[in-house]
């Protein structure tokens, strides 16, 4: 007898002269065969004794023999009688129940194979990797939309930067206008001050002119009086009246008027020179002050323009850095959200795969327990079959192996057979990656002495 474990074979049962047992990773099956020295008698356990029937039961002779077990057991006056018949019936019933279990396990094995096949088709490496829907056709659209969003964000940042530059330029022009307006108002204030000084000088000149006219009128009036007096004196001197008076000498009016005129002219000239000197002094000091103020204003204006340029450059750099920072923050937020979504999706897939793996392991453990139970049943049945053969040997006296019906007599052969089966069990995730690998070695030794089989299985 040989025991074969295979990770790829999913067949149930095999026939041969020595019998065989084949197990798959998804289920279990059992077949056993043996021969008995009684010609025409054969029995199959998932395989016929010495035949190829996998249906079980009693029937099929060795090498085409025609005697059946049913006929053998049906003969009340045959080799077996009494308790031996009951034993045979009990064995037959137990064998039938065992075959029913084998068929049920075969159906369960096929069902598990279909489930595993469907699971691999659904969650295997070529599938959607555990997703209920295939979104791969949307990936190019998503990438294109991401590129459009990035391009729009960049364009928006450029527009914002240009807007900020235009605003800063407008602020610069506004500051320049305010400075020019302040300078214009200062110059106008200076002009108004000079106009007031000019008005004062004009008033002073007018006053002097009025004084000059008054003095001229007074001089004309004095000249007129002098002429009248001269005429009166000349008329009085034209007669023959001699009047001698002893009086003080008279005042010379001409000399007096000349002296007065000279005094007033000197006073007017002095006033004119004083006014001109004061005006020149005030004008010089004012011109010097205006020149100094203009130089200071020009220097301050140049310094202010330079400071404004520096401020504008720094503000432009600040706005550019702020826009870059905002863009990087948006990119970072978007990247974090994308990776969080992907991480959540991967965690969900891992949870689903772990649950499925746990379910598969549970089912595998159940199948393993069923296989161990069936193996115990097999060993027990082999013992009962051996007892059955001993019973038959007790009735018949010998056991022999016959290659054909009506062949030669009893033959004695000693043969031994050793079968070593290595099974590689690999755990593969849905992506096709090997998680773990185990190697099971099964050694089977079969020895035949006088057509009696002795099987030993070691692993």
Curated annotation (Swiss-Prot):
IF rod domain sequence ranges: 84-399
Give the principal location in a single coarse category: cytoplasm
Give one GO biological process term: hair follicle morphogenesis
| Chain segments carrying region Tail | 396-459
Region (Disordered) residue ranges read 436-459
The segments labelled Head in the record are 1-83
Q: Where in this protein does the record put region Coil 2?
A: 257-395
Q: Name one Pfam family in it.
A: Filament
Say yes or no: keyword Coiled coil present. Answer: yes
Annotated region (Coil 1B) at 142-233
Example GO CC term: the record gives:
extracellular exosome
Q: How does it assemble?
A: Heterotetramer of two type I and two type II keratins. Interacts with KRT6A to form filaments.
Q: Which family does it belong to?
A: Belongs to the intermediate filament family.
This protein's name:
Keratin, type I cytoskeletal 27
Q: Which gene encodes it?
A: KRT27
């Amino acid at each position: 007898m040989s025991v074969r474990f295979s990770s790829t074979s999913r067949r149930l049962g095999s026939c041969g002269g020595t019998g065989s047992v084949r197990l798959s990773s998804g289920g279990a099956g059992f077949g056993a065969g043996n021969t008995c020295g009684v010609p025409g008698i054969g029995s199959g356990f998932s395989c016929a004794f010495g035949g190829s029937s996998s249906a079980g039961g009693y029937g099929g002779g060795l090498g085409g023999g025609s005697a059946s077990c049913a006929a053998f057991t049906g003969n009340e006056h045959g080799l077996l009688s009494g308790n031996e018949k009951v034993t045979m019936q009990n064995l037959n019933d137990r064998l039938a129940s065992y075959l029913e279990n084998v068929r049920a396990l075969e159906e369960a094995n096929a069902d598990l194979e279909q489930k595993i096949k469907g699971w691999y088709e659904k969650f295997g490496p070529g599938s959607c990797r555990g997703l209920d829907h295939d979104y791969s056709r949307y990936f190019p659209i998503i990438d294109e939309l991401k590129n459009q969003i990035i391009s729009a964000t960049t364009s928006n940042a450029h527009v914002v930067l240009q807007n900020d530059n235009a605003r800063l330029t407008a602020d610069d022009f506004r500051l320049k206008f305010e400075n020019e307006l302040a300078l214009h108002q200062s110059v106008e204030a200076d002009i108004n001050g000079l106009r007031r000084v000019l008005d004062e000088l004009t008033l002073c000149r007018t006053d002097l002119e009025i004084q000059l006219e008054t003095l001229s009128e007074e001089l004309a009036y004095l000249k007129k009086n002098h002429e009248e007096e001269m005429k009166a004196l000349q008329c009085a001197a034209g007669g023959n009246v001699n009047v001698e008076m002893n009086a003080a000498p008279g005042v010379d009016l001409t000399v007096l008027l000349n002296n007065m005129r000279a005094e007033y002219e000197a006073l007017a000239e002095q006033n004119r020179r004083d006014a001109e000197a004061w005006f020149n002094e005030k004008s010089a000091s004012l011109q010097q002050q205006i020149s100094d103020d203009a130089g200071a204003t020009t220097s301050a204006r140049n310094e202010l323009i330079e400071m404004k340029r520096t401020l504008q450059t720094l503000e432009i750099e600040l706005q550019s850095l702020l826009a870059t920072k905002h863009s990087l923050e948006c990119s970072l937020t978007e990247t974090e959200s994308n990776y969080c979504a992907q991480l959540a999706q991967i965690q969900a897939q891992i949870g689903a795969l772990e649950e499925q793996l746990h379910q598969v392991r549970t089912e595998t453990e159940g199948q393993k327990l069923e296989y161990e139970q069936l193996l115990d049943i097999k060993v027990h049945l082999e013992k009962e079959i051996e007892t059955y053969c001993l019973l038959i040997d007790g009735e018949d006296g010998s056991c022999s192996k016959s290659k054909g019906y009506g062949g030669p007599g009893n033959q004695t052969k000693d043969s031994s057979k050793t079968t070593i089966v290595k099974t590689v069990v690999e755990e593969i995730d849905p992506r096709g990656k090997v998680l773990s690998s185990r190697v099971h070695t099964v050694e089977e030794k079969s020895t035949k002495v006088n057509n009696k089989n002795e099987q030993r299985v070691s692993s």
